[in-house]
Amino acid sequence: MALIQTAFIWVAYAVAVGIVALIAAIFTYTYQTPRDRSALVSTVTIITLTSLLATVLLLPVDIALVSSTTSKLGAKKDWATPETVHNILLTLKIVYYALYSFDAVLCLLVIPFTYFFYEEYDEIDSEEGTQTFGQRFLSAAKYTLFFVALVVILFLVGFFVPVAKNRGSDMDLDYFKRLLAENHGERALTFALGLLISLGTLLYILYTSVGLALLPISFIKSAPSISAPQLSETTASALEQNRERQRQLEGRNAGRDGGLSAKDQRELEALHREERTLVRRERLAAESRGDGKSFIVRAWTKTCAIFRPLKLIGGILLLILSLIIWVSMLITGIDKAKNSFCKQHCGYILGSINIFQPINWIFVKSSIVFPIDYVLMALLVLFLFSSSVTGIAAIGLRFLWVKLFEIRKGHTSPQALLMATVMLTLIILAINYSIAMLIAPQYAIYGAQTFCANPTKFPGDQPDCSNHPELIKTCSELSSGEGAEKVCTPSVVSTFLNRVTVNFPFFGALAFWAQFVFLAIFLIVFVTALFRTPKLDLSEIDEDAEADEEEGLLASTGRRFGATWQDIRGKTQNTSGGAAGRGIRGDDDHNDD
């Protein structure tokens, strides 16, 4: 029975990794620009994102495996011998160390090498045969040596840096003694992870907080809708007026010596530019309607239009989830700041939950029946990941106030994609800390484990609480006694993260207090976004259409226009003002605004 249960847990994890690999591939191909697509960049991005998400999604597996060793009566199951439990923990440690090490190598070595390898490519030299693969490889490797030196220095510092020592009676518990790392190799990896988490926390409080506020609101308050039929009609009307005005100018100056006057010439040139814009916009509207496409494509377009109103409901649900996450983090933060017995000396580890925390309660209750908690954790991780992507897309890749790259669907360069992947690597490490330490702290450490506090008659016997349910206690860091020591098994990830904060208290204090900055930024952006009306940027649409037209890719990246009944019917509504009254401005008029 134990073997079947363990196998089921690992199979569920394998399925989850397969799903996140698909999500990583969709993310990569959705955001990268088609005309500069690189197979190497795409592969590295997909592998990196899959590895990162797999690292975070190992938490429910960790909880399920350690929780499976205990019964509802607070005793170890018959098959859960000390040797069996040790083997389970050893397997989890190997997987964790492998994933964390792989993440670090990808972030600090593989992605920089891929960035320089792509930058070294010269299309003209490659076609002429003056640039070979070996030259590009050696040149990229030369620039990557800096990052190799950085990794070596990082691990050397972690290998020799002194760790925190026992700090009095507060740290005398067995749980905290085990956290004080004595192995130098483990200490080096702990230091490196703590440094990467700290760097990721700085990005996390900026990008994830903004995305967590903007993502639900973007579903609810989308930009003003323009239906494809309405856009087509207004564009056709404006195009007709444009060409009529051109004919008037040409007719008025037909018999004039020297041709058009300077004023008329400038107006005619502006009309020509506007005409090109309107023609592109007309073709774009036709693409969004599915004109010239198969019946399946047209049916899919109308089906999407029908279900777009569900976007509002989804936005409301995501908004509720965002607020619950915010409240849960605030509750845990206050609880830790007030009730942590070791404060900044151990990264504000909380002995036990003192205030009801909704998300932690949901996960603890759902962990009783696997894989309910796994599904919930996967959804939570993907939501925070999507929020991070939304934040990066909204703010862009910046150095101080200078925007270096822009992250947009279908318009992200390979360099920007690699830099965004590095940022997401660090952010996901910070998300892993936030989930385990603030969002669901009790669940992340012991899950639903309990222990029987009823004393045993003989040493080595299992405690029996079948007739004393009131003596069944919840496992926590402060649990003591023979029953807790034999039954309560902390998760590997919580032990690893707590080892970072206990051995290097600076990292723990930074990661903890940064959560309050995260909450403050979320609140500011959330309130601002509630009262800010989104605008439809037609100039951006025109620029996208022009770029796509130049590359012959207009059909593959047509933009979606709002969800209205007109999209479903394929016809425009009759309005008193008409298209001519509203019109559509060209590039020059738009820029004048």
Curated annotation (Swiss-Prot):
Region listing for Disordered, in residue ranges:
237-260, 564-593
The biological process GO terms on file are:
protein localization to vacuole
Q: Which Pfam families match?
A: LMBR1
UniProt KW keywords: Cobalamin, Cobalt, Glycoprotein, Lysosome, Membrane, Transmembrane, Transmembrane helix, Transport
Q: Which InterPro entries does the protein's record reference?
A: LMBD1_LysCbl_Transport, LMBR1-like_membr_prot
Among its keywords, does the record have Transmembrane?
A: yes
> Which compartments does it reside in?
Lysosome membrane
Highest taxon in the source lineage:
Eukaryota
Membrane-spanning segments:
7-27, 46-66, 94-114, 144-164, 195-215, 312-332, 349-369, 375-395, 419-439, 506-526
Q: How does it sit in the membrane?
A: Multi-pass membrane protein
This chain is glycosylated at: N574
The cellular component terms of Gene Ontology attached to this UniProt record, alphabetical and capped at eight, are: vacuolar membrane
Record GO terms (molecular function) = cobalamin binding
Q: Which residues fall in a compositionally biased region of kind Basic and acidic residues? A: 241-255, 584-593
Q: Which family does it belong to?
A: Belongs to the LIMR family. LMBRD1 subfamily.
What function does this protein fulfil?
A: Probable lysosomal cobalamin transporter. Required to export cobalamin from lysosomes allowing its conversion to cofactors.
- Output this protein's name: Probable lysosomal cobalamin transporter
What organism is this sequence from?
Answer: Botryotinia fuckeliana (strain B05.10) (Noble rot fungus)
